[in-house]
Amino acid sequence: MGSKNNSRAKILVRGKVQGVGFRYYILQRAQECRLSGYTQNLPGGEVETVVEGDKMFIEDLYRAIQRGPKGSEVKEALITWEDPKGNFRTFEIKK
């Protein structure tokens, strides 16, 4: 891995974020930023995203998540920085 691929974050989003294309929105933004990881719906109605890559691009993704896609309502987006593990090759939507 390159020296810039050295950040990992977990992003938890609350609000009207399920049933509005939120995970597909995140997938598209993450792929545009060349980030790896996954996004998934949680049973409590939240969307969780775990992402690795360049910190600047993770911050770009976080800002996009705070805005959300049309039809969504983001009430809260929490980001937690973690040590990168390097165990993702692509970005995917987990069921």
Swiss-Prot record:
Family annotation (InterPro entries): Acylphosphatase, Acylphosphatase-like_dom, Acylphosphatase-like_dom_sf, Acylphosphatase_CS
Active site annotation, chain numbering: R23, N41
GO molecular function: acylphosphatase activity
Enzyme Commission numbers on file: 3.6.1.7
Keywords associated with the record: Hydrolase
Domain Acylphosphatase-like: 8-95
Signal peptide: none
Catalysed reactions listed for this entry: an acyl phosphate + H2O = a carboxylate + phosphate + H(+)
Residues that span the membrane, as ranges: none
Pfam family, one: Acylphosphatase
Family assignment from sequence similarity: Belongs to the acylphosphatase family.
Name this protein carries in UniProt: Acylphosphatase
Organism: Leptospira interrogans serogroup Icterohaemorrhagiae serovar Lai (strain 56601)
